[in-house]
């Protein structure tokens, strides 16, 4: 398990590896697909961080989550997998092409039905949310 680019100590890295779940074929494919994008691939949430997000979402029993900055959907897949069975995730992605890539990856991962992707500036999407909308988990990427 890498501790780059965000340094974490070995004890935390071991804990995440042991408790947060591994990387299946879909996640490995998204990692490869994103790496092929060149220098912008650094925008992908690191696998260890994404696994930790999934664990946090699962442990909190979150029903409704938000992600600002979806990129290729890697973090969104992990967040959606951690949600309660009838939970939902709303993702905000500025770039329409990246949103389409994320949608395909979410669908392939089997969590597409839980995820809405809003294309455009996140501030506009957030302002459009109903006032009474409760959010249990938010990830600003």
Describe the role of every protein-language-model region.
Residues 141:
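Switch II (G3) loop of P-loop NTPases
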């Amino acid at each position: 398990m890498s501790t780059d680019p965000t340094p974490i100590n070995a004890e935390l890295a071991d804990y995440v590896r042991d408790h947060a779940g591994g990387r299946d074929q879909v996640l490995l494919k998204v990692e490869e697909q994103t790496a092929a994008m060149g220098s912008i691939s650094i925008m992908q949430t690191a696998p260890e961080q994404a696994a930790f997000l999934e664990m946090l979402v699962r442990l909190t029993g979150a029903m409704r989550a938000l992600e600002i900055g979806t990129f290729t959907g890697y973090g969104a897949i992990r967040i959606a997998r951690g949600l309660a069975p009838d939970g939902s995730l709303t993702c905000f992605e500025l770039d329409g092409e990246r949103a389409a890539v994320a949608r395909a990856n979410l669908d392939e991962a089997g969590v597409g039905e839980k995820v809405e992707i809003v294309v455009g500036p996140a501030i506009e999407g957030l302002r459009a949310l109903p006032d009474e909308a409760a959010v249990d988990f938010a990830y600003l990427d």
